[in-house]
Amino acid sequence: MKITVENLKKSFGDRCIWSGIDLTFTSDEIVSIAGKSGQGKTTFLRCLNGLETYDDGRVSFDGELMPAGTTDAKKIGMVFQGYCLFPKMTVWENILLAPVYHGVDRKEAEERAERLMKELEIYEERDKYPRNLSGGQQQRVAIVRACMLEPEILCFDEPTSALDGATIDKLAQTMNRLKEKGMGMIVVTHDRAFAERISDRILHFEEGHLREEIVA
């Protein structure tokens, strides 16, 4: 899969956050987006996922235009900062909600959930509520949930925030396993060391402009 971004522009009121953004993302790479707070990194992810609109430009998935505020949930997914799990639903219910809503056969969805949860070592926690999980466990639940529609590219918003070193190591391993299975990733992070560790490319948003570097 290939995401193409052409001449994208986003403003909040009179303030232009970024403009003239031209990028491509593919499902065989991990790309990190770095930059100071307030540079519009998370907003960019939300635009790609159809959660916010942009002012001008084009976003296309494999050549198919995605109008502002729309997306294809079977091609791109997102793991939010803070995970956004439903507190009154069990882990199992959280994970099955999206595929059932999107019309995936219940039995198929349950089999997929079990397989993914076992791969990420979270299956034994399936009957618990989010409040009873550690931060790392909640994140793995959020990753499984985001993978349930089998997107080709998965976005992460500040995935290392509030995680300890050992949990960050497990996250890096999880991302590498997903990449080996053919899933690309776009990762917003302030953690420079983590970005260098996982990324094929690092993008920097600075004062509305974009700079790119290749990670050796």
Predicted regions and their residues:
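A short, proline-enriched helix->beta-strand linker immediately N-terminal to the Walker B motif
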Residues: 148-152
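The feature captures the beta-strand-to-loop junction immediately N-terminal to the Walker
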Residues: 34-36
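Catalytic Walker B motif of ABC-type/P-loop ATPase nucleotide-binding domains
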Residues: 154-157
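Conserved structural motif at the start of ABC-family nucleotide-binding domains
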Residues: 3, 18-20
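Conserved ABC ATPase "signature" region
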Residues: 107-124
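Conserved ABC ATPase signature
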Residues: 129-133, 137
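Helix-to-loop junction immediately C-terminal to a conserved catalytic motif
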Residues: 49
